[in-house]
Amino acid sequence: LPVALDAEEVSVRKKTVRFLGLTVHKKDTLRIKDEYTIASNRPDIASLIWYTMDVRGLDLKPEENVVKARGELSVFVLYGAEDTEAPVQWLEYSLPFSGEVECPDCTEELIPLIEASVMHQSLEAKPDVDGEERILVSDVVLELDMKFFREEEYDLITDVYTPIRECVPEGKNEVLERLLVRNFSRCRISDRIQVKE
């Protein structure tokens, strides 16, 4: 894309374009490890039967040479209890988390495009200070594909004319990405659902 022509006898027509230029592209991982102690009115854990974990409300924000992360880890677990009256118990809980990933050349002004996916997740029971299996240890590893863009502005030459000599501009088509909307808004939704008995 021609962006300058410094001959006095040549007339040029220019067009100002704004587009996104990729500044930083980095892949990294974020580990979320936390513990949860089950309530005292629940029986001890004999064995874990089934569990699922979700990362909710993940907020990734670039700052100076670092990306800060915060969100909530939601866990649902079925476990076998040592209590014979109720051999199968269920438990659902959420744990807030925060962390950070190093990202050289990142700044707050850059426009982030960060994709996060769960790479690994595990849940295990461990004994508390009394030796009873009452602590659940969750371990989740997120894979982050981080791209940071900067909005750039260039004057492109769209036409050239001179009466002195013949000018044949050569050009080619390029695909440029442009920022349409930059949105920082958040929306909190709450509702009540009635369950028929």
Name each model feature, range by range.
Residues 1-197:
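Viral structural modules
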